[in-house]
């Protein structure tokens, strides 16, 4: 199936990096290498890329993209395109990986579940961004992953193809192999529409 995303202009470093990779054909043949039901689908890892036989392709992917976290304007509601990154201990500036991205799915929250989640986030002693009432309403309406807010750059959103994201997030995975799908879910082709 097809997934159409819009990239945010107020995250220009991430937008431009993603478009550069799309236009180079980098994502063609990559897989969604990490899939966690009711959480997210992650793709773009260089090591998963299928190389075209008879063609030498070399990409410089040994860089990071400076964080462009614009919270609360962009939060981890369902269908957000976000940049993966190393954890806080290795990466206190929250710089993004050069190629890895994820699309959020998360769960739909009832008012009671949302209240429980917010209280848990407040009491865990981690530096979570506690969602405002308006953002909580968004999570109850659309679903999402609130514990990632203000920790990762959200740089776009799915405009069409959420049903494809849903199918991918429901595939069988190997939990002992970093949640890799048992059968490869391949990005056949990524192109810039406009």
Regions found by a protein language model. Give the residues of each.
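Cyclophilin-like peptidyl-prolyl cis-trans isomerases
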Residues: 1-194
């Amino acid at each position: 199936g097809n997934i159409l995303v819009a990239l945010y202009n107020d995250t220009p470093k991430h937008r431009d990096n993603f478009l550069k990779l799309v236009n180079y054909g980098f994502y063609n043949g990559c897989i969604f290498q990490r899939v966690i039901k009711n959480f997210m689908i992650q793709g773009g890892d260089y090591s998963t890329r299928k190389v075209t036989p008879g063609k030498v392709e070399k990409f410089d992917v040994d860089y990071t993209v400076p964080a462009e976290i614009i919270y609360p304007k962009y939060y981890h509601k369902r269908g957000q395109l976000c940049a993966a990154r190393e954890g806080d201990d290795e990466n206190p500036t929250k710089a993004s990986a050069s190629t890895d991205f994820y699309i959020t799915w998360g769960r739909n929250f009832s008012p009671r579940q949302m209240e429980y989640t917010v209280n848990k986030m407040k009491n865990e002693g981690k530096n979570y961004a506690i969602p405002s009432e308006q953002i909580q309403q968004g999570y109850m309406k659309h679903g999402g992953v609130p514990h990632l807010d203000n920790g990762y750059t959200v740089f776009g959103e799915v405009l069409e193809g959420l049903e494809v994201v849903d199918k991918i997030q429901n595939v069988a995975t190997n939990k002992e192999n970093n949640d890799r799908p048992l059968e490869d879910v391949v990005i056949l082709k990524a192109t810039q529409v406009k």
